[in-house]
């Protein structure tokens, strides 16, 4: 009985230790089960990589607005720098205008030319600053849109300018206006160029004088009447009056 009991105990122990691992049994062996879990771990790693890709895309999307903001800052800085330069230029022009004149260095004509030039620069600077401040469009048409550089360009520019100016030729102030205009625009010219312009105006003046003389001569010819004209007619009238007077005097002498 004891031997039987011992045999049963050994068999129970054997049965206890011979029980197979259900996990390994289901997995089809230790090695296969381990590979399966390792595969699942790799899937989890791939999922983590996908998250990393999403994070990188988000970071790129966040970086782009920062680039745009920096570009806007650069543009704003450029505008501010340009405004500072314009302001500095205006101050320099204003300072030069307020400086006392130096007659020992510049002639009166040169002083006038310098003042006109500085005034023009200041006006242009003020205009450009106003346009930039208020966002005015620089699109212009006609004579204001021209920027002549060649001979043909200046010829066309001259025609448009002539048409613009001569529309006021009926004004009482037109001649004085032209005199001042020609003097002002010729101040910066060289002597040789001034001589050419003077000669051209002299020739024009001579032609106008000839035309005026011819016109007066034609008017005189139209007023002449055949047979002595107006003077002859007056002479005849006086003769008739004298004949009448002579007859009256003869009658008086006969009466005496």
From Swiss-Prot:
Post-translation: what modifications? Phosphorylated. Phosphorylation is enhanced upon serum stimulation.
Bias (Basic and acidic residues) = 58-104
Keyword Protease assigned: no
Q: Extract the coiled-coil ranges from the record.
A: 68-133
Region (Disordered) residue ranges read 1-106, 214-243
Which residue ranges have biased composition labelled Acidic residues? 38-57
Which intervals of the chain are annotated as region Promotes stable association with the 40S ribosome? 241-256
Note the superkingdom of the native organism.
Eukaryota
Q: Which Pfam families match?
A: eIF3_subunit (PF08597)
Q: Where is this region: Sufficient for interaction with EIF3B?
A: 1-67
Biological process, per Gene Ontology:
formation of cytoplasmic translation initiation complex
Matching entries from InterPro entries are given as: eIF3-like_dom_sf, eIF3j
Q: Which GO terms describe its molecular function?
A: identical protein binding; translation initiation factor activity
Tell me which residues bear Phosphothreonine: 107
Where mainly found?
Answer: cytoplasm
Q: Which family does it belong to?
A: Belongs to the eIF-3 subunit J family.
Q: What does this protein do?
A: Component of the eukaryotic translation initiation factor 3 (eIF-3) complex, which is required for several steps in the initiation of protein synthesis. The eIF-3 complex associates with the 40S ribosome and facilitates the recruitment of eIF-1, eIF-1A, eIF-2:GTP:methionyl-tRNAi and eIF-5 to form the 43S pre-initiation complex (43S PIC). The eIF-3 complex stimulates mRNA recruitment to the 43S PIC and scanning of the mRNA for AUG recognition.
Q: What is this protein called?
A: Eukaryotic translation initiation factor 3 subunit J
Q: Which source organism does the UniProt entry give?
A: Bos taurus (Bovine)
Task: From the UniProt record, report the name of the gene that encodes this protein.
Answer: EIF3J
